[in-house]
Amino acid sequence: MAKYQFQTEVNQLLKLIIHSMYSNKDIFLREIVSNASDALDKLKYLTVSDDKYKDVAFNPRIDISFNEEKKILSVQDSGIGMDEEDLTNNLGTIARSGTKAFIDMLSKNGSGSSDLIGQFGVGFYSAFMAASKIDVYTRKAAGNGKVLHWSSDGTNSYEIEELTEKSEAYCQYGFDKSETVGSVIEIHLNDDSKDYASRWKIDELIKKYSNHIAFPIYLHYVQTKYNKDGKAEGTENKVDQVNSASALWKRNKSELKKEDYNDFYKTISHDGTDPLMYVHTHAEGTQEYTTLFYVPRTAPFDMYQADYKSGVKLYVKRVFITDDDRELLPSYLRFIRGVIDSEDLPLNVSREILQQNRILETIKTQSVKKLLSEFKKLGDEAKKLEAKTEISDDEKETLEKWHDFVKSYNRPLKEGLYSDFANRDEIAEIIRFKSTADEGSGENKWTSFADYVQRMKPDQKSIYYISGSDEKNLRSSPLLEAYKKKGFEVLIMADDIDDIVIPAYGKYKDFELKSVSRAGSDEELGVDKEEAKKKEEAFKPVQEKIKKALEGRVKDVVLSKRLSDSPSCIVVDENDPSLQMERMMKAMGQGGGDFVKPILGE
């Protein structure tokens, strides 16, 4: 038996799981069953797309058995199986960047982080919450026929050996038949988890977490037989299918309840909370496809990581194709979880073909439009409810849903203004901003471009905004003084990407977007030109003195029209990057100390 050391990050993860995560131990079975389903999906795809697997008999099933006396719980699948390299890569290492940050997050969140294990793609390790030891028996489909045995108690190392015919597990799990492929996860339950070796506990958890797994799950158990007098007279082995095994997204919407949608979301997302909303679409006509999309209640932890994992699975006629294609939806919708199932794509479609496929491009285009339409609908509904003095409990839930949506997903949606030219006007109707008009109205008061335009002064020609990194500081900026006095509303933009996406968007309908921190944005303040000229002449000597004193530090010193109380302010030239942009670029190692010279207004 060869012994291997776990990767350092795996060791850290296992220590956290074993010693800190105990609040929701139930999810380990969900993760193991989900992995079994993935293994079946992979083999199903290969049997129809790869000649190497054409002779493999695909009999999809997941079998769960237990031994109450020995405290053993086993989950067996007839999926793709693993060879030695797979065992090392899948069960001995974590091949993702961001692992250290992920482990740090788990450390901080402690026992409340069990759901994140599956979301990061390492759900197998969650079984150590309930296990004193785990044995894995596996034979890879279309491989060399060997049965391998992986074993670990979760402390530092694992062992791999070839399983011989003399081994009890070899025959117990059917590996004596050459056509048996797939994997068995045998969990030796610790003393605190022995309740999981129970028919009723397993049945309850499968129905709760895995009912909508698309393959049949069978529970094996021993039932006591009783005579007519109620006395036990022996036992019999029983096997029951314990899940519905249907592709929920293919079912008619009228058949499904909210609970069905929520349960399926938890199955595919590894998230223990209900989703914020879902969008289920059946399209027929020149192309036939089904989509079921979810918006998570909490933003995915890797939403701002460069190697974020796609949350959308692609199927063709219910055959799983991939869950690792980030082109299925644009990156600004990377928080979406769900399923796309096409009736028209070829089953043997490759990743390269996917990127250029017109059918998939059409599905993507229509899906984006549908999602943006639903987001706008929710926002419009919330706006109506905010105007009401009394609302029902259901209306309150809708309002909270919208507030949560804005807090979590306003920022990534803004990216679409920059990257998605075809849908930027639709996105502009959804995104929200803080405003000088909502002073003291609470954290849930937001303004849309449409709201701003509705409140504009009759003679106002531009939409004004101020950008920076801190909302509180922006609200007290002297740059706002004259605009407030004039009664011009100013949008407060405190997201780090605002200075990139807003200038790129440039104009909402017929109204130009102008930053109050830029020279030339104060033309509408209505200063008397003759009066301004007199002041300019009077202050010229002072300006020259200040300019000389600040030589090399500022680009210019000018008389400002935008101040009413403060003696001076700093703005940037209309052709220069903003100060917020300068900070961002310096943080990325671009630009030196003299990157942008500001203009002093007095």
Q: Which stretches of residues belong to each language-model region?
A:
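GHKL (Bergerat-fold) ATPase N-terminal catalytic module, capturing the glycine-rich phosphate-binding loop
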Residues: 1-191, 195-196, 457
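GHKL/Bergerat-fold ATPase module in large chromosome/replication-associated machines
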Residues: 116, 134-177, 190-195, 200-602
